Amino acid sequence: MDDAGEICSFSRSSSSAREDDEEDQRWAALEKLPTYDRARTALLAMPPDGELREVNVQRLAAVERRALLQRVAGVADDHARFLAKFKERVDRVGIKLPTVEVRYENLNIEAESYVGRRGLPTILNTYTIIMEGLTNALCITKKITHKIPILHNVSGIIKPHRMTLLLGPPGSGKTSLLLALAGTSTLKVSGTITYNGHSMEEFVPQRSAAYVSQHDVHMAELTVRETVNFAAKCQGVGHHYDLLMELLRREKEQNIKPDPEIDIYLKAATTGEQKAEVVTNHILKILGLDICADTIVGNNMLRGISGGQKKRLTTAEMIVTPGRALFMDEISTGLDSSTTFQIVNTIRQTIRILGGTAVIALLQPAPETYELFDDIILLSDGQVVYNGPRDHVLEFFKSVGFKCPERKCVADFLQEVTSRKDQKQYWIGSDDTYQYVPVTMIAEAFQSFHVGQAIRSELAIPFEKSKNHPAALATSKYGVSMKELLKANIYREILLMKRNSFLYIFKAIQLKLVAINAMTVFIRTNMYRDSIENGRSYMGALFYGMMMIVYSALAEMGPAIAKLPVLFKQRDLLYYPSWTYSLPSWIIKIPISFLNTTVWVFLTYYVIGFDPNVLRFFRQFLVLFVLCEVIYALFRFIVALTRHPVIASNMGPFCILIFMLSCGFILTRDDVKKWWIWLYWISPLMYALNALAVNEFLGQIWNKSILGYKGPLGRLVLGSSSFLPETKWYWISIGALLGYVLLFNVLYTICLTFLTHAKEIINDEANSYHATRHSSAGNKGMVLPFVPLSITFEDIRYSVDTPEAFKAKGMTEGRLELLKDISGSFRQGVLTALMGVSGAGKTTLLDVLAGRKTSGYVQGSITISGYPKKQETFARISGYCEQNDIHSPNVTVYESLMFSAWLRLPVEIDSATRKMFVYEVMELVEILSLKDALVGLPGVSGLSSERRKRLTIAVELVANPSIIFMDEPTSGLDARAAAIVMRAIRNTVDTGRTVVCTIHQPSIEIFESFDELFLMKQGGEEIYVGPIGRQSCELIKYFEAIQGVSKIKDGYNPSTWMLEVTSTTQEQRTCVDFSQIYKNSELYRRNKNLIKELSAPPEGSSDLSFPTQYSQLFLTQWLACLWKQHLSYWRNPPYIVVRYLFTIVVALLFGTMFWGIGKKRQNQQTLFSIMGAMYSACMAMGVQNSSSVQPAIFVERTIFYRERASHMYSALSYALGQVAIEFPYIFLQTIIYCVLVYAMVGYEWTCAKFLWYLFFMFFTLSYFTFYGMMMAGLTPNNAMSAVVSTAFYNIWNLFSGFLIPRIRIPVWWRWYYWMCPVAWTLNGLLTSQFGDVNDKFNNGVSVSDFIESYFGYKQDLLWVAAVAVVSFAILFAFLFGLSLRLFNFQKR
């Protein structure tokens, strides 16, 4: 046996020696190549036998590419080893890596804004600001705004090779400091900031540094890999290619053989088409995102990655930059302490080894994470309280009289020691000697401390610019060539089109259906060419086809607006210039225009009976295709100009209206007033319709004479509409349309280049964190009566249909299981922590228990105090603080809480008690000073993330629930705010309530404030359910008893230790299955017995029930919803103010264009013009109301889903509130329009006629508005709503009776005429104004007789039209309510 072993060993060693010899020979051959070729050539071990192959990394075959990516993926498995090897390689040849030292001196930052009540965006304030702007422009008054100081005269140095932790309470100026240091601040900054002695003007800071925002702004439809890969393609490799070339040159000179693993990685990451993919895979691996790399990012309405993964994605997207300085803002929100430690440690390894510079702001760093940092910057009230080595920070605070207690995290101590409320507990002396030490005094003391003196001394000596490495600071504006940036944007645009392919397919099918509808209405068997009047029918068909193309493009505005936040972020960070974004969004959409035009023209042209000449067929196609491009470009320009969904949805219909009025169909060129004739000549629709008309009516089929007229019939038809009748005008019109395509796309690009988001409004009280006053209410419990309840659950399984991405990877199971046999109990008076690594299923379990899942498959039993859970009852006695803080943006903190309390507290609670209770809860979570602060939109305006989190908790607490689920209540909070929240939660539990919290990164103090722990591992399995114990003794005892688990270190955070020792990596290393160990433990059996005990109803008890489905009566629900909607509308100027401005402009436009036409009776064309005015106003203002209400509905609908899940109100009461609040605004809009138009157009001034006009316009605007609301309720998103709405706008347009009167509509479609609301509007408007007019036209026919004979309108049936328009308004409002009740498009 020994001989055999020796022979085998010798054989293996001989084989190994041969492989080494072969590798040496290949390396020797490689070394002989020129440096340029060697940079592109590497030795790659090919699977499965590891055969070495010489490959060109720039031109890889598919199999080589896969092998390369597999090989370099292994590099990320040990990031520190890789970095050390790389550093060793560059050190061997004497290459010095670039470093950056950042200095800031006498730095001041301030903002300018309206504050207090003037800061609230009410309609009145908006009009006041507009008037002030006008008076300021005329130098009559001065701008009344306040300067809000953020940072005061701060100075410091951030050195390379060192990790700097930025601490400070919210509102202290952390984000402003990071933005200023990164060179991306939009506020007023004074003082000096230098990189290696160079001012910001001497280099490109956006490419020399990377700012990682605390807000996760991504395109929801892209996957994680695609998001990071796009960033990598745009950022490029920086100086790394030059480094590689120099490295290879020196190694060749010194005859040094590089490490093969490092060599192939560097070459793959800096050259070839796969370089972005290599960097992307590496970053995803080290940040733990490789497990969700092919999952879409998602958003509130589209299921995607978790909040913690989204936060890591934000980090990944930015650290692909080759910049040497990192400024990272709250990157740990939503991450567990173990994951945070790993990420920060990975960054630390990079910074330490490669000489980078990093400033990272963290909210609740665990002690072990805190110790990874070298330096500390502590901000408070806009001043630097400490800036220096971590080792001296406790020494400094001890010198001013404060000491950090044992088992207290130093980071938590630092954030609390400057707070007026928390400072006293850290005072070294006796309570009698304590006096509050203001932040200014501490900051002054730091200047005298030896660390502060050393910084001042160093700042006094300028940095020697000669020491600056040439590659340290970027001087080129963009990372790669314009060609590469354009390719990256084109590829991304194609991806987005694929992900939204359903939308485009749906739109094409819809267009096909409308085309079938149109061609069967204008069918050739009913279309004649024997009179000018019949020629008008053909003109109407051309006009309708043109407007169909125009309206179909409206749906593009929603998706375009949704992408703007990502564009502005990436543009400002110099990912790419705006034109590389705008050009693909134009070019890639050309096939969509081609498809839409093809569907329309190919279906309708010959069926309607246009000129059969095939050349004229393709000419019509060309006009409509180019017009489609014009309208898409116009709407993109509007989106970029307004940058707001509501304003854009108003501007779109407004532009359509102007161009439609001036196109020559509704009002002929001869009838256009001389002061508006310029509008006729600049209207793109005029050129489109003129080209269509010339193409059709100059055809051979129209070249015939009719009795009583001279010249061909086609020219007579053109002349009757005042169109330009020469053939040349077809090509002139095509040229004009192409010019508009270019113009609007250029304007779109200019807007994207120079415009930014509107400045947010700052509330004075919300701005100051330390405005929160000390309150003794922090120790109070809630006083309202409630029923203590427990919840048990057994063998819970939750699964979803297997995603396509998993199937593509070979997963054959039909369902993906996210929770596996989960059992437990949550009891009254017991505070339970639900913990686990990111992706363990914590939020999923809470969603299942709370009944919030809208998809998937749930198995198992859930009982409430022994009785089976009934969701209707459970929603009444439970509260759920969701991870995403979803609130109505246009109400204040106090109003949000009052609304929740009003609808969720029992009807027996009177208003005074309810108000007192709300104030008590505000004091409990310390948001009383913020009661008048506007909530706002996350990341845009209003409350900061930590205040929003406290509001989320308060909204549930005011419901006085018996059971409360809290999903990451301390996520996004600093240590002090987290302590406030935990005190409030602890007080809540002490009143006898059942509270469960998922929690990340708890400090020792917060973790040990919980009574029990429910611990889950990745894969949705429980591994510990039981008591934590005093100083976590029970938890530690359980895990230390497991073989292979390392003992906890003294002073180590038990929660962090627990997550580390139970991680998947540790399970694999120790071969331990913690889930199986738990299920075989005595603790598991004890829990099973407890579940069994609690699952049986107590003797003499009864199942909880309520006499009504909701806490409040229907009328109260409606009043509460109406009250909140009133506040939301009053504070939504983009919606209301723009609507009224639009109405005024439209009224003046109509009044001046149709001036005095209501008094004329000369001929029938005059009546057609009057009806055209009515038709245009009805369609334009109606579509504007319908399209502008939809974004407002979608913003509130997400909040509605949360509130409905809590059983606050019925869908019908909410819908009625939404409908009712529109009536006063629509009525005022109607008054404005009717008074102006009625007077200027010259309708007959009688009370009855004016009231009829008012009546029909009011209900027309009402049913259009309610139709828009109904469509928002029936569709999953704004884009789909716009697409579906557009179809009905066009159908209503067709059957309105204007393009083709009822008597000319084919009999098989005439039934729909009676179902068209616009037809009844035109009937009512025309009949009420002219149905009793007996004046005669030039041909002797009276006005009333012509109306009855041509249109079929009868004066004595006016009341039918009135009933019809009222009925449509009621119908659409009812369907809106029904849609909210029946459909839930939120995917959870």
Curated annotation (Swiss-Prot):
The keyword Protein biosynthesis does not apply. Signal peptide: none annotated. It is found in: Membrane. Keywords: ATP-binding, Membrane, Nucleotide-binding, Repeat, Transmembrane, Transmembrane helix, Transport. PROSITE patterns: ABC_TRANSPORTER_2 (PS50893). It is a multi-pass membrane protein. GO terms for cellular component: membrane. The keyword Transmembrane helix applies. One of its GO terms (molecular function) is ABC-type transporter activity. ATP 1 binds at G168, P169, P170, G171, S172, G173, K174, T175. Gene3D superfamilies: P-loop containing nucleotide triphosphate hydrolases. This is ABC transporter G family member 52. The lineage of its organism: Eukaryota, Viridiplantae, Streptophyta, Embryophyta, Tracheophyta. Residues 135-406, 791-1043 form the ABC transporter domain. The chain crosses the membrane at residues 503-523, 541-561, 590-610, 621-641, 646-666, 675-695, 732-752, 1136-1156, 1167-1183, 1223-1243, 1250-1270, 1280-1300, 1305-1325, 1357-1377. Residues 484-697, 1116-1330 form the ABC transmembrane type-2 domain. SUPFAM superfamilies: P-loop containing nucleoside triphosphate hydrolases. InterPro entries: AAA+_ATPase, ABC2_TM, ABC_trans_N, ABC_transporter-like_ATP-bd, ABCG_dom, ABCG_PDR_1, ABCG_PDR_2, P-loop_NTPase.
